[in-house]
Amino acid sequence: MTDKTSLSYKDAGVDIDAGNALVDRIKGVVKQTRRPEVMGGLGGFGALCALPQKYREPILVSGTDGVGTKLRLAMDLKRHDTIGIDLVAMCVNDLVVQGAEPLFFLDYYATGKLDVDTAASVITGIAEGCKQSGCALVGGETAEMPGMYHGEDYDVAGFCVGVVEKSEIIDGSKVQNGDVLVALASSGPHSNGYSLVRKVLEVSKTDPEQFELEGKPLADHLLAPTKIYVKSILSLIEKVDVHAISHLTGGGFWENIPRVLPEGMQATIDESSWQWPAVFNWLQQAGNVSRHEMYRTFNCGVGMIIALPAEQADEAVALLNSSGENAWKIGVITQTDAGDAVVIN
């Protein structure tokens, strides 16, 4: 009988010990996100969460998202600490536009070879995003898959569930002629348009760590974490009658605003009401990107747009600014029989 080498999972490229070490590293930060409705801790086959008792007719709202090729830029620049905030933001911001309070979040982290330090940095960012949005990080999956990803490259996805009172769902059906649009400033490109960002960097031969914009590296502008608007919006909808909220993500102004407009309504955006942050001016100039394409690809400094009655617009702006946002009136809703759903002038 010939002797054969005894193979292990580690020989195949999967390090179970590294996975266990990661769990030990992240337990503390995950615990900080806990909500009273969560039952049990990490390690179960499934996470249990009760519905908050304040809801009479609770409706669950769910969403899933990633961070696109912003992740490639983060990996290239070896900056992993805020990409987790981006991941949470992309999910919870999509929930809150419907009036939903985020309850719990799960993440999926996949890599060719698990680097515990990198993964811990990413998941610490996820926990920070959960704290900012008031939702619990109840579980996740870390998949080490040799041969599926190059080296220590990784991908992340997020999954979030929230709850809203049935009678208070925000779906755009109340939008009407004369409504005012209020904008909330973004922190940068957020997590959209990064394939174009990377192409502009390539074509312009720009090193984002060396090139400075407004006194700091371009990389700082490009990797600024996506703003999480949950707490300020949940506070706002308790005080004013919000008709619709649009989260400006992929598709920019042209595609996201119409998603919350009833048929026959047109949003007119006043371009003079704000100035593009420097990073967007740089992207447009360095990439010779058309104005239409900028508004189609990027948020251009606007992360959210809220439609509400004209008589409540000033109050809404004041409330949002007092909660730490940079808010302003950006446009109006009018009735139209024809033409584009969004006009920017």
Swiss-Prot record:
Pfam families: AIRS (PF00586), AIRS_C (PF02769)
Entry keyword annotation includes Ligase: yes
Keyword Nucleotide-binding: yes
This protein's UniProt keywords: ATP-binding, Cytoplasm, Ligase, Nucleotide-binding, Purine biosynthesis
GO-annotated biological processes: 'de novo' IMP biosynthetic process; adenine biosynthetic process
Pathway: Purine metabolism; IMP biosynthesis via de novo pathway; 5-amino-1-(5-phospho-D-ribosyl)imidazole from N(2)-formyl-N(1)-(5-phospho-D-ribosyl)glycinamide: step 2/2
Catalytic activity, EC: 6.3.3.1
GO cellular component labels: cytosol
Superkingdom classification of source: Bacteria
Class in the EC hierarchy, top level: ligase
Subcellular location: Cytoplasm
GO molecular function: ATP binding; phosphoribosylamine-glycine ligase activity; phosphoribosylformylglycinamidine cyclo-ligase activity
Catalytic reactions of this protein: 2-formamido-N(1)-(5-O-phospho-beta-D-ribosyl)acetamidine + ATP = 5-amino-1-(5-phospho-beta-D-ribosyl)imidazole + ADP + phosphate + H(+)
InterPro entries per the UniProt record, alphabetical: PurM-like_C_dom, PurM-like_C_sf, PurM-like_N, PurM-like_N_sf, PurM_cligase
Family: Belongs to the AIR synthase family.
Protein name: Phosphoribosylformylglycinamidine cyclo-ligase
Organism: Pectobacterium carotovorum subsp. carotovorum (strain PC1)
Gene expressing this chain: purM
